[in-house]
Amino acid sequence: MSETVLSSATREVTLGFDRSFVPIGERINPTGRKLLAKEMKEGDFSRVESDAVAQVEAGARMLDVNAGIPLADEPGIMAKAIQLVQSVVDVPLCIDSSIVAALEAGLSVYKGKALLNSVTGEEERLESVLPLVKKYGAAVVAISNDDTGISQDINVRFEVARKIVERAADHGIPASDVVVDPLVMPIGAIGAAGRQVMDLVRRLRSELKVNTICGASNVSFGLPNRNGLNGAFISMAIAAGMTSAIVNPLHTEIMTAIRGADVIMGNDKECANWIRAYRELPAGAEDRRARRGRRRRQATA
């Protein structure tokens, strides 16, 4: 059994096979959010702050922080965003960038043990990211593609994941600090994408004994009622053994699916999390919770 321990300055979160699923809030990401990108580029992090607080209140146990803004000082923005987020919430963070300098900028100011997002099987990426993971004592997301791109063959993706785990070991990084992303593809374009991910998660768990992560909303791209489909997918992924995912926790359907799957899989001891989230609500409170969620989404749009 593999456990990945991540931390902020004051709180630990553990990814593990028999532990509650870890939802990672996705909203601190300027991609596709023009106003957020403009504000972050100009040094206004008020929306970052409100997004951070709202996601944790909604049930996110970690937050992903991305500062990818074209023609901007991404390392500088990343460092400021990490410091700001850590000042307003106490959950561990996932530092997310395709630029190595931005990853190191975030790591250099981070308090705790971060999850670095990400490394691939590409040689250049392996040799630039893994030394950072070791230097700062972080964990890392391993994405199952390499120099040849994303394979539709899950056996190829498995071998890429194995390669990354082995190369991490060469750098003194244990398999417990490698969290594999099996790559969720849009099911509207690739009909077998969901089944492939489930099969690959089971194999990663049984053979490599690593924790797993994904961008859950990728599965529903281009389809109607995306939240309903995302919730169905995440429930099945948890049943297959996935231990974390980057999601939008402001969508109540997603959080209900996650909490429910944890109960059904026996990973919510005595149903404590489910009871805390729902039983104590008085009549009508569930509707009010949904309305608050809608207001939070509108406020942070």
Task: Provide a role label for each language-model segment.
Residues 1-179, 185-301:
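Domain-level signal for soluble alpha/beta catalytic cores
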